[in-house]
Amino acid sequence: MTEHVQPANPSDATPQHRYTAELAGQIEQRWQDRWSEEGTFNAPNPVGPLAGDVPADKLFVQDMFPYPSGTGLHVGHPLGYIATDVFARYHRMQGHNVLHTLGYDAFGLPAEQYAVQTGTHPRTTTEANIVNMKRQLRRLGLGHDERRTFATTDTDFYHWTQWIFLQIHDAWFDKEAGKARRISELEAEFVSGARSLEDGREWASLSVSEKEAVLDSYRLVYHSDSMVNWCPGLGTVLANEEVTADGRSDRGNFPVFRKHLQQWMMRITAYSDRLVDDLEYLDWPEKVKTMQRNWIGRSHGAQVKFQADGHEIEVFTTRPDTLFGATYVTLAPEHELVDDIVAAEWPRGVDSRWTGGAATPAEAVAAYRKSIAAKSDLERQEYKEKTGVFLGTYAVNPVNGHKLPVFIADYVLTGYGTGAIMAVPGHDHRDYEFATEFGLDIVEVISGGDLTKDAYTGDGTIVNSDFLNGMSVADAKKAITERLEADGTGKGTIQYKLRDWLFARQRYWGEPFPIVYDAEGNAHALPESSLPVELPEVEDYAPVSFDPDDASSEPSPPLAKAVDWVNVELDLGDGLQTYRRDTNVMPQWAGSSWYQLRYIDPTNPDVFCDKENERYWTGPRPEIHGPNDPGGVDLYVGGVEHAVLHLLYSRFWHKVLFDLGYVSSSEPYRRLYNQGYIQAYAYTDARGVYVPADEVEEKDGKFFHQGVEVNREYGKMGKSLKNSVSPDEICEEYGADTLRVYEMSMGPLDTSRPWATKDVVGAQRFLQRAWRVVVDEESGALRVTDDAPAEDTLRALNKAIAGVSEDYTALRDNTAAAKLIEYTNHLTKAYPGGAPRSVVEPLVLMLAPLAPHLAEELWSRLGHEKSLAHGPFPVAEEKWLVEDTVEYPIQVNGKVRSRVTVAADAPREEIEKIALADDKIVALLDGQDPRKVIVVPGKMVNIVR
């Protein structure tokens, strides 16, 4: 037996052995120490430094890891962590080898901005924040394998982030094979003649630099002079996903401008089809799948060629059936052809609405581009007022030869299709609005609408379309595409909204690129032996930011200041030469794109993850999950806000690693679960400034801060809203197990719920009742007996076991808690002098996933030397799950009038007889015979008068 803790200095009014917050704190500290000392939650690997005996039944549970904020956790943060801990603990008790740990997503803008504000190096603040967060998480009793934790800022971790970057850089996407291959294989095909150059040149005739340029054009990581989102206020470029709907930065809320810059890009678009198609095999919320499908935006249509002033405008349309209804062509203002085809002067008689008041088309274009520079893509698509200018040029419709005026307009984007549209105002709302604004023709080509009022976008018969007349829309699409292909003026094709991933940031706090440049500016990937490229320690790590509204500013990365680090002498095969390091850093998504794999093999110095360990933890298991199982982490829990950022990026990286043979799973996460959020009230004064929520008083339905009335709003919990509640505060006042039970009892895990500190005491009272089932509050003695339990208790026990097991498996911890409360109440009422051990111990075991410290303490007091962390979890006996009796509601003419309880195996005739003999029914019938009696076995009795 182990020594049991006692509460220090209990008050006279409180029984000496009551389960108080003070006693809970002592119990929790003691068991946390023991778990850590004994490695209770250490999960063995098949091979390597963490090798051990591994059972076939395994479970890999993962949380979306946190950013180590300087403010620490509030009670909303642990919601998902506690839920996964309950899930992991339950399955560990079922005999599974459970891998559950937690790392820290520590690179990126937030840490750097916080460091700049405080004047402390980001590594110093980040490491201090991690220490504090680890302390907070440990206090919650999370059963993590502490050997597997890391931060993305650890050199041993980002060594492998850089290594994966090099593998992607050294790969290309073979469209015929539908997968990534090594760039050396592509070069071998060029050398052998198995693959020809697109321009017809012979490979052997190319210079070394020309060959490198060809290979670079195929790589999955490439340099591009691309249109990017430039944020002067942050001093960096941003991915599309990091820009808000109103054209501002997600971090800092600064204006974002579109401009051309030379940047590293990742060719995620090569995987568009697989990223869409493989969603079918994932056990993910349909909402997230839909978000990814919409973000990738795959659409079938036709690419049509319009001749314009000696140039060819390629237009992608999903509605080639409406080609005869095109009355103008519109280009995105940034389209590469705009400057080539803009006319020198306005055509005679041009409509003044088309010119923007400019003297020449070129002046109109320049002024228009300037006017829309600060608009986000979403603003440009949704803004009600349609704007644009005429280029003074006409394009020829390939199906009827009509001359169509060519405009630029901000509602056309370069990021989708070809950046050019054929405008069909009769059957597209935005085109209709533009045509109405500019006095352009509107032609009906699909019957069924009233074009004097609005565009018609419904189905119908094709009209005013020559050889298509009388066809359905579907038949017309097929026929026009065949005609375009036959004439050489178009072809059927597929387009995507997804753009390649902008993979560089002009910041300090991120992973350095394993890339150097020679004197001519050519990029060279470093050999693996040069990894890791460590982030240099610099005194001035602040970003070079600019006037937030200065769209003409240019990036100036902080790493460029580290001259001694930037300039380096290396021998890359041509003798010792001076090179210049890349001074950008990777985006904050880099580490999270593969971290699940490092959890598997966190201390391996030779590879990022041993193949045998990866196969064990994340390899496909078709015998369990079906023939199309992609493999991956068994359960991944986190917020839905990462649907098109982290989750899309991680799928892309993982698929490349799969194609190159480094992993056996084709997807990183087999099952995804999105938890809801804990929300809270916040309060603002007359100025709209938030005031501390804990200083607000309620009087007669109104709310006051320091005597002044304030407004109440409901939403997220956070420091800026001044409504945060620290888990430390709740643990101190009630204990960690109480916090765990309260958060899991608040409602279904996938819904948001309001925090109410005053309600936490309810969870504490439940745990106190569970404590009293085992321990006498006055003496501290055990209250259990060796008596045989009553049959109704055995029924209650086995019903609880079956229900709680089902709930834990399905992440329904709120209903599991309700069943445990019900069973605890049964034991309390049925056995005031002490319950039988045989029905108490299963309660303690069932309680363990939710309230592990309390359960361990009670299990120990019941005489067990070993921890219950590895079970066994109780198993229900089927014979006790069959009910002896059934309650039947009795309806009379459709309304429930009474209820009767009968034997579960009672025949229909007896049920009818008992129902008709019920006092309330006898009174209602008043001596009359019912017209009909319907007995639904096990459900109800319906009487028709």
Curated annotation (Swiss-Prot):
GO cellular component entries: cytosol
Top EC group: ligase
Annotated GO biological process: leucyl-tRNA aminoacylation
Binding residue positions for ATP: 719
Localization of this protein: Cytoplasm
GO molecular function, one term: leucine-tRNA ligase activity
Residue span of motif 'KMSKS' region: 716-720
Enzyme Commission number(s) of this protein: 6.1.1.4
SUPFAM superfamilies reported for this sequence: Anticodon-binding domain of a subclass of class I aminoacyl-tRNA synthetases, Nucleotidylyl transferase, ValRS/IleRS/LeuRS editing domain
Keyword vocabulary terms for this entry: Aminoacyl-tRNA synthetase, ATP-binding, Cytoplasm, Ligase, Nucleotide-binding, Protein biosynthesis
Organism domain of life: Bacteria
Positions occupied by motif 'HIGH' region: 66-77
Annotated Gene3D superfamilies: HUPs, Isoleucyl-tRNA Synthetase, Domain 1
Reactions performed catalytically: tRNA(Leu) + L-leucine + ATP = L-leucyl-tRNA(Leu) + AMP + diphosphate
UniProt keyword annotation of Iron present: no
A Pfam family reported for this protein in Swiss-Prot or TrEMBL: tRNA-synt_1_2
Family: Belongs to the class-I aminoacyl-tRNA synthetase family.
PANTHER family: LEUCINE--TRNA LIGASE, MITOCHONDRIAL (PTHR43740:SF2), LEUCYL-TRNA SYNTHETASE (PTHR43740)
Protein name (record): Leucine--tRNA ligase
Gene: leuS
